[in-house]
Each structure stands twice: as C-alpha cells, then as structure tokens.
C-alpha cells in the first residue's frame, strides 16, 4: 500500500472471540484482551525462521535468503503491512513505540503478564536491526521492492518478487532512517536493562554508532533509497536526530545528548515547530514531550529555559488534540475520532492517544497541569482523551465495529493483507502464484480464511464511514506503525488492575463472587527430599463472567520459592488446562511449561505468578524438575 504524508493456540483464539463478544454486549472495553491480541499481529508479521513458541499457526518461514545476494544476512524483522517489504523507517518507529511502552508501562504490562510478549516483540525487531548494522557507518534500510511486491498477491511463504536489499552508507546517507533506528535501539536498551543487561548494552552500542552516522552524514533516506519514495516518503530528518538524542540521553544519562538537543533546538525545529501529528514521519511531538519530562522532574539545570520552550510546543500538541488550542485544533470526525488524513488515519489516532497518555503521567507525577489557550487541563483530561480514542477503536463508533481485527463481535473480515486472505501454506500446500492470488483470493467477497488477530486497520473516513473491502486499502490495511502504539495505550488503560481486564472504572465483564465449593483457593507445596527445597503454589480466582452459557474463571497462580537458596530451570506440569495461559512458555512436551527466559531463576523467597482462563475447576499444577 502506498502511504502518503506524513498453550495460546486455536482454543485460546476461539475463547478470545467469546470473551470479546461478552465485552461488547456489556458496552465495556476489555483493554487486557485487546492488548493480548496486538502481540498476535506482530507474530503474523514476522519474517524469517519462526520460533517454536509461534502462536500464529497459519504462518510459516519466509524471507530466509533476504540479503544474501548482497553478501549480508537480513533474515528476520517484520513485514510492513499487508505486503512483504521490510521498510526500515516504520519498522524502527514501531519498535521505538513498543519499547516506550515497556519502559513507561512496565508495571501495567507486568501485572497483565504481557511484559514477556512485549520484549519478544521488541527483540524480533532489534535482532534484525543488529544484523542490518554490520559496520558503524552502514545500515541496511530496506528489503524488497515495493512496486513489484504490490503487483503480486501471494503468501510470504510463496514470495516470487524481488528481495533486493538497500543500504545507507557515507555516500548514500539517511539521517532520518538511521536516527529513528538509533532511537529504537536506545529505547529498547532501556526496556531490556532490568532483564538482560548484556543485550541492553549491545543495543546501546549500536544506537550510539547509528546516531553518530546519522548526524555526521546527513541526508534524506529516500534520496538514497528512491524505491521507498512512493511508500514512506520522509519529510525531513531533523526531528529524528532530536528524537534519537532524547532517547540516548534517557538511556545513558550522558549530557552530550541533552546538549545536542538543546544546542540544535531552534535550528532543527524542536522548539520552533508546533505540530498536530505524531507518526512514523513526524517525531516532533514525541521529542517535545520526552524532553518535557526532564523539566517536570526538576532536572533542567542550565537548560531550563530551552526545555520550557520544548514544553510549550508539547502543550501545543496536547491542547490541539483536546480542542483547547485557541482554534488551532486537530480535526475530529462526528463520532469523536481525531482525523489527520484519509490514508490509514487510525495510525495517527493511536500514536497521539498513547503520547497523551504518556504526557498525562509526566504531568501527574509533577503535580502539574496542561496550560492551554482555552484554559488549564488536569492530567486526567489527557488520559480521558486517550481513552476516548481507544474506545472508538474498540467499537464505540458509528459502525459499532472494532477496528482491531478479532476483537469484539464485529470487526473487519476482508483485511487488505496477503497472508491472511489466502489459505495457510499448511492447509493448501501448493504454491499460490503472483497473478493467481489476485484472481482466486484478492477479489473474493468472502472473509479472510486466516483471522489476523490484533491488527489495527486503516480505519474510517472523516465522516466515520468504513467499507469492509479488501481492495479498499486506504481503510482496510493494517500497519506496524499504526498497531504498535496500542500496546502502551491498552496497557495504560488496563491500569494494572489485578483481577480485571478493564482499566479504571471500565469493567469488562459482569463479575460476581466465585462459587465456593471446588473453586476454593488452596496452597499446595512441593518439597522433594533430595534437595530440601520447597516450592509453594497459591491458586486464586480473581474474576469470573458468563459468555454464552458458560461461566469462565480467571485463575491466578503464585509460585513461591520458600527455600533458602535459588532455583532455576523450573519445569511445571499443568493438567486439566482447557483455556489460554499467560506468563509461562510451553516446552514442546505435553502438559509441560517453564518460566520465561527473563525469569529463569527464582531467588530464595521470591514469587512469580501466571494466569489462565477456563470454565470449570482449576487446573492441576505440579513440579516436574528444577536445578
């Protein structure tokens, strides 16, 4: 699509649909369920060899030889949208947004047992960026040819189109793309720092080199990779340089990067541009809010005056969203959706909503208010706006439709997406050719054979109208850059409210006290004589609801190491499990699960919890082994 301007297995997916239907019926929005689905979209977009834990089973390995013709391995990364090009600029922006969520919303993501999924989604991108940056002043910025790719309609596993790779170097600069990739890696280093310090340091090293490359050799990446102009035309690179400097300062604390953002604030537009858009192309509002955090924390020092200028522009963006900007406001549809432009408008709404949720937190922490031309606004007002956009996306709109695929009883079923619109290679093993895909699948009036859960489509027009038509790519195509901000937005609205998938007062389901009988929470202890260790499980039911004729229960299990020494490589046996589970990884052996990679060891006295949902009695949890 051209873009102008600037064990979770089958049973769990079926259950998710049932739960979402119950949500819509009650006119509440299940932010936890929506959050869970967004990660499935990123799994559907994966390029390369897929991991054993891949939950989107209709996808197979693809793009395994990417870059080899140019002498570099560029396997991995994400396909951009409904096509199979790996565009570096929007992919890097998506990883930056995922990382921002992991950093600023770690509490909410952890309480919803989604931190692991967030880190995996980030790493699928950052591992690719590391491959794409083999030398300090080289960055491979794109794989695939947008023109030839769009002439074909085929599964990624069947690709016959060009997989040419395009690079940036001192003779072919791209400060915007290199700067955004530096920002992504710096933000990701912060996300991984509490869980994997060595990987965090590696990411930061690449981020520093890429920033130096972007700053020293300046130019638009679309001049060096002309193939990208028709799809992701960059409007400038100054915002990305400031954006990268802001993230590197936050990741390192090095005053060099803050001084860079201060010294170049006027020249590069950071304190000059008041904008009404935040997107893969325009980062000014993000820069302004990120740097305002320093001022709000009282750490401005000698840069206080310049930081105040940055905050003035941050306020301009926020006030424009809230329609309190003295007439210079962002347009909204009759239904209340912010409207920036016709092509894939929801990407702007999702990004702005998350940005205002972030700014709300920064203001609240400083006990400050938003100063608009039309009056002062409490931080809660910004969060309320963010919630209004999220609710519109999830179904509070004229169409009564969720624009997140797979959420709720009504959502787009004819998505402009090659992989989802053609039967899986595991269901139809014969290849689907370039033209055959158009004839047999693109033009079908039926819904997609593979539901691409969690995808945020382009969305409705300025009058809240939406046409569920595969050929209507302006409205029906999902993108990485549009879906990524939803992770932080839904996590924030979930609010860390244990026992409920709603955020704040938004209760997703009818909840009642669980029946006593066989659902009584009881601790169980595992104490093998050979080691003297003691592992305790504490089961509890945190909520329940009715979907159809079945009552479902949300079970929380706390694993506690009651011994005096650490244990590692813990493997659990879970029997009688009939629903989805969060917080544990399947091992490949029947009924066997293990802790995630970032939680390989339980210290003495440490606890870890996981969650599962099912109807009927609780599952049986026991220990198989540990070290």
UniProtKB/Swiss-Prot annotation:
GO terms for biological process: cell wall organization; cellulose catabolic process. GO terms for molecular function: carbohydrate binding; cellulase activity. Residues 1-26 form the signal peptide. It is found in: Secreted. Its EC number is 3.2.1.4. GO terms for cellular component: extracellular region. Glycans are attached at residues 196, 465, 561. Keywords: Carbohydrate metabolism, Cell wall biogenesis/degradation, Cellulose degradation, Glycoprotein, Glycosidase, Hydrolase, Polysaccharide degradation, Secreted, Signal. InterPro entries: 6-hairpin_glycosidase_sf, 6hp_glycosidase-like_sf, CBM_49, Glyco_hydro_9, Glyco_hydro_9_His_AS. The active site is at residues 83, 416, 468, 477. It comes from the Eukaryota. It catalyses: Endohydrolysis of (1->4)-beta-D-glucosidic linkages in cellulose, lichenin and cereal beta-D-glucans. PANTHER family: ENDO-1,4-BETA-GLUCANASE. Belongs to the glycosyl hydrolase 9 (cellulase E) family. This is Endoglucanase 5.
